[in-house]
């Protein structure tokens, strides 16, 4: 009898498949997102050297200043994280990125995050 696959296993399988195709370079680093049940995280990564260039999350002190709360899991919170990471990326001169949705469906928080990043000036 085939083993039932959990949501997490399916997401990790999709993530592996995506990572084979998506690779960040110095000219066009990878914008990677992760969402847990309580928080939302985003990083811009240069995969050639394996360094995180910019990061932001709902645990960030700047997020707490803007929203007045620590942590968050709503669509609005994902948009605030997008504003923070887009601003930091543009300050470092990063305008073009490759979007890595981390195996999550392009829907809800992930879509809102991507739309806000585009609105702030990131191209992907």
Swiss-Prot record:
GO CC annotation: cytosolic large ribosomal subunit
GO BP: translation
GO molecular function terms listed in the Swiss-Prot or TrEMBL record: 5S rRNA binding; structural constituent of ribosome
Keywords: Ribonucleoprotein, Ribosomal protein, RNA-binding, rRNA-binding
Keyword Oxidoreductase tagged: no
KW Protein biosynthesis (keyword) present: no
Pfam families named in the record: Ribosomal_L18p
Subunit structure: Part of the 50S ribosomal subunit; part of the 5S rRNA/L5/L18/L25 subcomplex. Contacts the 5S and 23S rRNAs.
Family statement drawn from the similarity comment of this UniProt entry: Belongs to the universal ribosomal protein uL18 family.
Role according to the record: This is one of the proteins that bind and probably mediate the attachment of the 5S RNA into the large ribosomal subunit, where it forms part of the central protuberance.
Name recorded for this polypeptide: Large ribosomal subunit protein uL18
Species name: Aquifex aeolicus (strain VF5)
Lineage of source species: Bacteria, Pseudomonadati, Aquificota, Aquificia, Aquificales
């Amino acid at each position: 009898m085939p083993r039932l696959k959990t949501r997490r296993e399916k997401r990790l399988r999709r993530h592996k498949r995506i990572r084979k195709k998506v690779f960040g370079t110095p000219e066009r680093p990878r914008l990677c997102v992760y969402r847990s049940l309580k928080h939302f995280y985003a990083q811009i990564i240069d995969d050639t050297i394996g360094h995180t260039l910019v990061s932001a999350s709902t645990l960030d002190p700047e997020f707490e200043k803007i929203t007045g709360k620590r942590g968050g899991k709503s669509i609005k919170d994902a948009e605030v994280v997008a504003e923070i990471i887009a601003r930091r990326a543009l300050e470092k001169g990063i305008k073009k990125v490759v979007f890595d949705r981390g195996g999550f469906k392009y829907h809800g928080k992930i879509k809102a995050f991507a739309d806000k990043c585009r609105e702030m000036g990131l191209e992907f």
